[in-house]
Design a protein with these regions (language model features):
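Solvent-exposed loop/turn segments at secondary-structure junctions
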Residues: 41-43, 84-88, 113-118, 132-134, ...
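Long, well-ordered alpha-helical scaffolding segments within enzyme catalytic domains
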Residues: 62-72, 134-151, 193-199
Length: 199
């Protein structure tokens, strides 16, 4: 067999391998609808207050509106949930789960920021429901994107939330894969400088 024929055979095998690999690949489902949930949206709850005097709800309502606008430009539909009509946390989460289910959202994210008694606490973390592989994958994607953008911050990781832990009701109540975003500590002056909204 001539060298040129051997090369042709190798190229044929490579093409066949690529075709077989492509056929095995699962079709990637396009993201159609995102539920953007503003944390602390139940009656009488505004969340923690940052060192800049802005509470979680006010801060994240603005983030939600910006995110919705950005997604619209990407051709992705989203719905902002910023008013959970109940004082009770469990009833608010039940309502939210049903509302997101009716909208048939592909993913759900709830926007927060962390806070602690010490101003030295800092970093970002993304939470998912324990046992949810899709939720873990979603949280990992967000964490990776965050770490590439804000290299100066401490990476607190992707965290699984289980029964009895804060945030579990949201993560368990909503039908699609879900995560809670905690991108910084509002109680940290150093991080507030990075994340405060500027008009």
């Amino acid at each position: 067999m001539k060298p040129s024929e051997i090369l042709d055979k190798i190229l044929e095998l490579i093409a066949a391998y690529r075709a077989a690999k492509a056929a095995k690949r699962k079709k990637v489902r396009k993201l159609k609808k995102v539920a953007i949930c503003v944390g602390h949206s139940r009656i009488g709850d505004k969340g923690a207050c940052s060192v800049g005097g802005v509470n979680e709800w006010c801060y994240n309502k603005e983030v939600a509106d910006l995110l919705q606008n950005h997604l619209r430009h990407q051709g992705i539909h989203s719905i902002v949930f910023d008013d959970y009509p109940s004082e009770s946390y469990s009833r608010a989460m039940d309502w939210l789960g049903q509302s997101i289910g009716k909208e048939k959202c592909d993913i759900a994210i709830e926007l927060h920021f962390n806070s602690y008694s010490s101003t030295k606490a800092e970093g970002y973390e993304y939470l998912h429901y324990e046992g949810s592989q899709k939720g873990k994958r979603l949280a990992t994607c967000f964490l990776n994107a965050h770490s590439e953008t804000f290299k100066v911050q401490k990476d607190r990781g992707v965290k699984a939330v289980g029964s009895g832990q804060r945030g579990v009701s949201f993560l368990r109540s909503v039908p699609p894969p879900a995560l809670i975003c905690e991108p910084f500590f509002g109680s940290s002056p150093k991080e507030w400088i990075l994340f405060e909204h500027r008009s």
